[in-house]
Amino acid sequence: MVYLRYFKGLILSDAYAPGLKWSDELKAYSALAFKYRDVRKYFLEKEIEVEENVIDSLPFPLIKDKIELRDYQAEAVKAWLKEKRGIIVLPTGAGKTQVALKIVSIMKVATLIVVPTIDLITQWKERINKYLDFDPGIIGGGEDSLKGITVITYDSAYTRAEELGNKFPLLIFDEVHHLPSEGYSIMAQLFASPYRLGLTATPERDDGKHELYPILVGPIVYRKSVEELAGKYIAKYKIKKLYVSLTNEEKKRYDGLRKKLKDFLSSRGLKLQNLDDFHRLVKLAAKDKEAREALLAWHESLNIAVNSQSKIEKLREILQEYKNEKIIVFTRDTQMAYRISKTFLIPVVTYKTDKDEREEILQKFRDGEYRVIVASTVFDEGVDVPDATLAIVMGGYGTKRQFLQRLGRILRKKDKEALLIEIVTKGTADYRLSRRRRE
């Protein structure tokens, strides 16, 4: 017989299994708690009797399942249940939350739902109340209540992983693309939870760390793209690119800055073609004045390209042409968002906007009192944005994730074709960012 137990983010065993190492301090074989499922499976396959005190689960609450799934959502649930581990990839607006809560309802085990933002805590709480008729526990944003279904931020899960690591058999990671980052990946390894679900619209990461998914949460078990769902479950859509040029003054300034950057890179035998190259430049800039000036030149030239005055004029034309549509204008930074707000007298939402004001703006947009709003990256994740029929992206978004998140904001109503317009500055870094995102 083998005895397994949990201790502060570790599993301890009095017998060896692959993945365990002897600890003189603990007088036991040990491993990070996420190895629990594999270690237990090893002993059972060897027909070794296991006595364990690992999972000390909170009781599962009384719920009332009110979830009706679409065909693809039911397929996703079925795919995950085969191994009770893995990631479900669905576009923004395709109902990942309903899929997850159906799994919670089927599994009927204590569940910890890990989310990146306070706004997502609020969103999940509302959905759990709506679909499961249960008021969940909340950890984060000043609240600290533990229940059989609890929603927690990634940061709080990180700080309390050792304490909570054996309380929840089912672990759900919303926006799971955050998980492979250094601190959060350690957090996931401190939980013994044998059942794990990841949710995202965009699993790939620029740094390649999505390769850690199989270890931390499981492989991708189900995936549907925007294209596969458009028309039947979410709106049909078109993407239109409109090109503008820098003003003469902007072009002169832009060319000077790019020359400064190019000259520096050439003098040091460096390139700036990918993320690794950029990280090398940032590291060098920390100790080298010329590298720092080159990095500033890169940043300033990108700002000129992304926030060109020509884009403001093109936006004016678009707002006039589509004056009967509900429109969200997305900007790369808050400076451009406030500039557009001031120019066109449009309500603006950025990270500086307090929660009450933001909710008021969104509600008025939802009710039709506001027809156009402008937002910076605050809408990327965790904000329940009302339906819009037109999204205008003011450029500067090099990642596919950001682009798909913006597209998802206009795909919720399937009775009308949605349109996304991207305004791109020709012959600049803005153009190259746009091309990279489309590849």
Curated annotation (Swiss-Prot):
Residues 77-221 form the Helicase ATP-binding domain. PROSITE patterns: HELICASE_ATP_BIND_1, HELICASE_CTER. The keyword Isomerase applies. Changing residue 278 to A: No change in recognition of 5 base bubble DNA, decreased ATPase activity with and without Bax1. Keywords: ATP-binding, DNA damage, DNA repair, DNA-binding, Helicase, Hydrolase, Isomerase, Nucleotide-binding. Residues 227-234 are annotated as: Flexible hinge region. The record marks 278 as: Wedge residue. ATP binds at residues 90-97, 127. A motif (RED motif) lies at residues 205-207. It catalyses: Couples ATP hydrolysis with the unwinding of duplex DNA by translocating in the 3'-5' direction; ATP + H2O = ADP + phosphate + H(+). Residues 248-307 are annotated as: ThM region. Conventional DNA helicases unwind DNA by binding to a ssDNA overhang of dsDNA and then translocating on this strand with cycles of ATP binding and hydrolysis to 'unzip' the dsDNA. XPB2 is believed to be an unconventional DNA helicase principally because it translocates in a 3'-5' direction along dsDNA instead of ssDNA, thus it is referred to as a DNA translocase. Forms a heterodimer with Bax1. ATP-dependent DNA translocase which moves along double-stranded DNA (dsDNA) in a 3'-5' direction, unwinding the DNA. The ThM domain grips the resulting 3'-ssDNA tail and functions as a wedge (particularly Phe-278), breaking dsDNA base pairs, probably using the energy from ATP hydrolysis to move along dsDNA. A DNA-dependent ATPase; double-stranded DNA (dsDNA) stimulates the activity more than single-stranded DNA (ssDNA), while Bax1 stimulates ATPase more. In an in vitro assay had no detectable helicase activity. Binds ssDNA better than dsDNA. The C-terminus binds Bax1. The N- and C-terminal domains are joined by a flexible hinge region which allows the two domains to rotate and form either an open conformation or closed formation. The ThM region is involved in interactions with Bax1. In complex with a partially unwound DNA bubble substrate the ThM domain and RED motif contact the ds-ssDNA junction; both are important for binding to bubble DNA substrates. The DRD domain (residues 1-54) structurally resembles the mismatch recognition domain of MutS. This is DNA 3'-5' translocase XPB2. It comes from Sulfurisphaera tokodaii (strain DSM 16993 / JCM 10545 / NBRC 100140 / 7).
